[in-house]
Amino acid sequence: MRVLVLGSGVIGTASAYYLARQGFEVTVVDRQPAVAMETSFANAGQISPGYASPWAAPGVPLKAIKWLLERHAPLAIKLTGDVDQYLWMAQMLRNCTASRYAVNKERMVRLSEYSRDCLDELRAETGINYENRSLGTTQLFRTQAQVDAAAKDIAVLEQSGVPYELLDRDGIARVEPALAGVKDILAGALRLPNDQTGDCQLFTTKLADMALKLGVEFRFGQDIQRLDFAGDRINGVWIDGKLETADRYVLALGSYSPQMLKPLGIKAPVYPLKGYSLTVPITNADMAPTSTILDETYKVAITRFDNRIRVGGMAEIAGFDLSLNPRRRETLEMIVNDLYPRGGDLSQASFWTGLRPATPDGTPIVGATGFRNLFLNTGHGTLGWTMACGSGRLLADLIARKKPQISAEGLDISRYGNSREVAKHGQSAPAHQQ
């Protein structure tokens, strides 16, 4: 059985790898010249199941108003006049209740924990190396209010059986020695010892190499134009003016997925959350992070690779704008100077931006659609790296009609209700354009 995977980020590549392991004949198509050239290229490097939390949370609407007035705010909104942007934000606001937050976080943690286990298994089986470390994540709180607010997250961690450790200032210095000199500006921390780190782009490149050995074909530099459909089936995909056919189709196009799906009557509430990162060469290893920290105030992660520090975070709801905002670089540099002032050379840092495909409830869309041979793997937001292996393996099981190792409840697009209006026979308009 032939499967056509659209998109070669970490999600599409993981999907292809696990499908090939199930015995499918897999082809991956992407407009870029190689895998992981867009959102997966320079993310924060964290694999953090315990910190899998939706942006839609109690108190966020009021915080968002406050953040609009702050120079170094973790969230910024640039209204584009796009109806989809307004609808997405309205849906996000509806998910900012305590009850919805608990449901959404459970789904995200469930998939993230499974994904971490899949990654562990993959690493044990293959020896894949991607500058990975398994030294945990430390979430830094600058105020006592942040420490107190962590109680609701700890309750979910306990319910999910995720190990954690609350740290005082001395505890922070113990797990991250380079922070000893600045511990007085911190109020405490929450550490998840089972979290991991690694270079997502490097991982995706090596996973693609392993997929090639399993027979997966990668076709780069090709324009994915539209889906051809009739009734409840996909007939093929128009790629560079030619109709390509398969038995099953997987859409893993990140923020560009809705453009492809809308003509089919599928309303996928995925919208880009623009994020930024700096990659900083290490000049003093003793003054650099040991693993990864998450600054709760600014929603920024600082992660240690072999000889580099990756600083990433923030979110702009600004449509498909990929321009580099110098104020965001200023914020990232400010946080590095605040916490690790002697760790790396900021003058040699590379600045990057990417569009994370976010759903309004934070949970990705993984699974079947109203079309019998079309499957989705998209909407992972800031957690694509964390959820990649689990999402790929889960989807492969679903396509193979095998019972997944975790519950898939609440993960597919049906949770949004009428996800497909009645689609007329015909072809879609062009999509997947930047």
Swiss-Prot record:
Binding site for FAD: 3-17
One annotated GO molecular function: D-amino-acid dehydrogenase activity
Pathway it works in: Amino-acid degradation; D-alanine degradation; NH(3) and pyruvate from D-alanine: step 1/1
One cellular component term from this protein's GO annotations in UniProt: cytoplasm
Spans traversing the lipid bilayer: none
Annotated EC: 1.4.99.-
GO BP terms in the entry: D-alanine catabolic process
Cofactor(s), names only, from the UniProt record: FAD
Recorded superkingdom: Bacteria
Gene3D superfamilies: D-Amino Acid Oxidase, subunit A, domain 2, FAD/NAD(P)-binding domain
Catalytic activity field: a D-alpha-amino acid + A + H2O = a 2-oxocarboxylate + AH2 + NH4(+)
UniProt keyword annotations, A-Z: FAD, Flavoprotein, Oxidoreductase
Coiled coil: none
Pfam family, one: DAO
Function noted in UniProt: Oxidative deamination of D-amino acids.
Family: Belongs to the DadA oxidoreductase family.
Protein name listed in UniProt: D-amino acid dehydrogenase
Species: Pseudomonas putida (strain ATCC 700007 / DSM 6899 / JCM 31910 / BCRC 17059 / LMG 24140 / F1)
